[in-house]
């Protein structure tokens, strides 16, 4: 299993959360039943306790909510259970403040204000949890308004001191926490499923590397290979480097003028396929072992279709090279090698007989304009095509 460089090595899988013990569930259900009975007794009795009746009923409702959270969602006891416990302590403090006087009353009021601030902080923390779980701004606003609406209704119930109003307020508090529990149950489960990390799947970086390697291999397989064979000890005429700056292949050691060199270098930094020429330099400042071309270039590559010139002082073959399966290597001449065309195809054969159709083809052509009197066809041009 590959290591995730961003996440680090995967840790051990967390064991599934087991259900709570049957004894704890039974005890919680028993306490929930007793709390409901006590709450109904206070609400339905004719006890004239005034505002204390409302506070006792509200305290029992908070106990009921805590028991429900413990039974169904124990993992939410920290945010929701702590909020209910803090509200329960504030309710008990209000019941105690109802009969206090003097400095104890002032101290109780300070504690009450401090408790209200804690309740507000816990509620904001709970809304942040809902936001992280994917709640929209409208859902958060609805929970926020429902919370403050219940507080206002509780204050009204303390003022009215009516049993039916107290029953309505307590049920609204229960509905608020049940709505939060249900929302966190569904959205929290979906959030955990979306962010579950499956180690069996490849990492995105690994998948990218695999695809790039595959594309590189495909591009390498798609490249055309030009098969050539050398004549004697001379370098080949054509190679895989088809991007030489001179417009043609670079078949030998490169000269300072970035031209092809199949033989010793001349003083004019041009291509030479044989020893230095004893003849004077041409006016085009280039080396010329044959008739001068009008394009001021070296005419040492594949020559125009001229007859063989045996009087060349350098020993070069002045005629055009034959692209056959053999090339004669005369003394001192490191002329161009042959092209292996896979079946004895000729360079001037426009039909490409015997050539492998999957390999690129090197054609010889002329510029179409005449040069010197000895070279009526102009320089030879090399064409590369698939």
From Swiss-Prot:
Q: Which residues lie on this side of the membrane: Cytoplasmic?
A: 2-23, 73-75, 128-139, 185-386
Q: Does the keyword Transmembrane apply?
A: yes
Q: List the disulfide bonds.
A: none
Question: What is the protein named?
Answer: Latent membrane protein 1
Quaternary structure note: Interacts (via PXQXT motif) with host tumor necrosis factor receptor-associated factor (TRAF) proteins TRAF1, TRAF2, TRAF3 and TRAF5. Interacts with TRAF3; this interaction activates B lymphocytes. Interacts with human protein ZMYND11; leading to negatively regulate NF-kappa-B activation. Interacts with host UBE2I; this interaction induces the sumoylation of various cellular proteins. Interacts with host IRF7. Interacts with host TYK2.
Entry GO terms, CC: host cell plasma membrane; membrane
Task: Provide the membrane topology annotation.
Answer: Multi-pass membrane protein
Q: Which gene encodes it?
A: LMP1
**Domain text from the record?**
Two regions, C-terminal-activating region 1 (CTAR1) and CTAR2, have been identified within the cytoplasmic carboxy terminal domain that activates NF-kappa-B.
